[in-house]
Amino acid sequence: YGLGARVIGVGECGVTVHGQEETPLFPNSPILTEEQMKNLAEGLNELGRRAKRKGMKVCFHPHVGTGIQSLEEIDRLMELTDPELVGLLFDTGHSTIAGENPVEILTKYIDRVGHIHVKDVRREVFEQVKNGDHSFLWGVKNGMFTVPGDGNCVDWDQIFNILKSSNYEGWIVVEAEQDPAKADPLEYAQKARAFMRTQLGV
């Protein structure tokens, strides 16, 4: 807070598999019980109340390999949490890997979005994870994610049109999540910077 942070990004980490390198992602993606979902929502509302007293906002990050990744799961969590206390951290890459349309999620929840992560997906690697016995970490290490404008899954024109026509004033954070030995960080940072300048004019 003392450094100017006003958003707290949080995620569900109680039943996750995304950090397990030997665990195939899709056959083992966790599903929360209704009791677990309600407990999570209750905890988020309480955290949101405490954050609000400090002038901060809690934003929940749906993440592949956790109990909240699908649109159905996002819908249920948003239904159970107070919009004044809990916002949404929107991530183009994770919503795509979860099998959802990020444009649909952003359209539906733009008024609750308080923080944004943008990254693209390489379909050929994603398909190997989706159809094989590969883990989330295997996918990351093998280039499943890349910077905006370098992949072939996210409809960036629609994403940015939604943002430009909204009242969103928060951060848009570019993520790459790639092996730096295979994808030079400077090269990809420059590629992302050029793409973001084209889309946003900044």
Per-region residue spans from a language model:
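Histidine-acidic metal/acid-base catalytic patches
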Residues: 45, 49, 53, 71-90, ...
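Short, flexible loop segments at the rims of nucleotide/cofactor-binding pockets, characterized by
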Residues: 64-65, 93-95
